[in-house]
Amino acid sequence: MGSLVREWVGFQQFPAATQEKLIEFFGKLKQKDMNSMTVLVLGKGGVGKSSTVNSLIGEQVVRVSPFQAEGLRPVMVSRTMGGFTINIIDTPGLVEAGYVNHQALELIKGFLVNRTIDVLLYVDRLDVYRVDELDKQVVIAITQTFGKEIWCKTLLVLTHAQFSPPDELSYETFSSKRSDSLLKTIRAGSKMRKQEFEDSAIAVVYAENSGRCSKNDKDEKALPNGEAWIPNLVKAITDVATNQRKAIHVDKKMVDGSYSDDKGKKLIPLIIGAQYLIVKMIQGAIRNDIKTSGKPL
């Protein structure tokens, strides 16, 4: 299930200012002996995963339609430029009919076997007003699938970022509240300790994939705060890829579902031993009761 590596034609579609920044970021990766990088994109359906992939590549590499369901299988897009290769893996939505789609996660795991994930983009929408239990269940499912270490290689990407919040809230206040609520959900669902989660330092980046996205004076797609979001996202991706945490290698053990069960398996001998001792103690107590009850008063 390999992907054909093609020359990065879409790179030329970016404004000159964006091209310069991307060349700088990828050059820093090559200086650290990273000649390739693999980015996994996960999230619920309809949050803008595929559109974000298209924006990052600068080409319509993944079909996006508001009137069609998302693809049912993962797709890897690979582009090379100047000796550097970027692989981005688009995936099906992780929710189906209001529940976590575990079948989709199994398909994703199978697709990823023997691959190494340098960065996870966990995608959601900025223009949503609340976080619910389903969001937590999605995080739990991702954690059970890849281990909580995956969150140490994660960026939270909030799409539809050219959003006008309610009149009483500034853009900065709303985006901060929205990102904070999602980060709290990730911490709760991943079951990471407070210090452990703070050390993981999940960064939040914003994206606007619409063709109506505003542009700055350098012709770059810009958010309401003036930020050129594509180079900002790529910089954040390269920062995570080089953050000293181990990349996530998906091996057969993880695919077979034994990853999250290892600790439980190690405890089985201890549990059996404890059960044996308890049974022996109960049997001894019963024998003593029988002996005691058999004595004359």
Curated annotation (Swiss-Prot):
Result after altering residue 208 to Q: Normal GTPase activity, but weaker nucleotide binding
Effect upon mutating residue 175 to A: Normal phosphorylation
Chain sites annotated for binding Mg(2+): 50, 68
Effect of residue 217 to N: Normal GTPase activity
Transmembrane segment boundaries: 37-53
Predominant cellular place of this UniProt entry's protein: plastid
Annotated ranges, domain AIG1-type G: 34-258
GO biological-process terms attached to the record: intracellular protein transport; protein targeting to chloroplast
Chain residues that bind GTP: 46-51, 65-70, 160, 208-209
Topological category with respect to the lipid bilayer: Single-pass membrane protein
GO MF assignments: GTP binding; GTPase activity; identical protein binding; metal ion binding; protein homodimerization activity; protein-transporting ATPase activity
UniProt entry keywords in alphabetical sequence: Chloroplast, GTP-binding, Hydrolase, Magnesium, Membrane, Metal-binding, Nucleotide-binding, Phosphoprotein, Plastid, Plastid outer membrane, Protein transport, Receptor, Transmembrane, Transmembrane helix, Transport
Signal peptide boundaries: none
Cofactor note: Binds 1 Mg(2+) ion by subunit.
Task performed by this protein: GTPase involved in protein precursor import into chloroplasts. Seems to recognize chloroplast-destined precursor proteins and regulate their presentation to the translocation channel through GTP hydrolysis. Binds GTP, GDP, XTP, but not ATP. Probably specialized in the import of nuclear encoded photosynthetic preproteins from the cytoplasm to the chloroplast, especially during early development stages.
Self-association state and partner proteins as the record states: Homodimer, heterodimer with TOC34 and TOC159, and monomer. The homodimerization and the dimerization with TOC159 require the binding of GTP on Arg-130, and a hypothetical coGAP factor. The dimeric form has a higher GTPase activity than the monomeric form. Part of the TOC core complex that includes 1 protein for the specific recognition of transit peptides surrounded by a ring composed of four proteins forming translocation channels, and four to five GTP-binding proteins providing energy. This core complex can interact with components of the TIC complex to form a larger import complex.
Protein family per UniProt: Belongs to the TRAFAC class TrmE-Era-EngA-EngB-Septin-like GTPase superfamily. AIG1/Toc34/Toc159-like paraseptin GTPase family. TOC34 subfamily.
Record's protein name: Translocase of chloroplast 33, chloroplastic
Taxonomic source organism: Arabidopsis thaliana
Gene name, Swiss-Prot/TrEMBL: TOC33
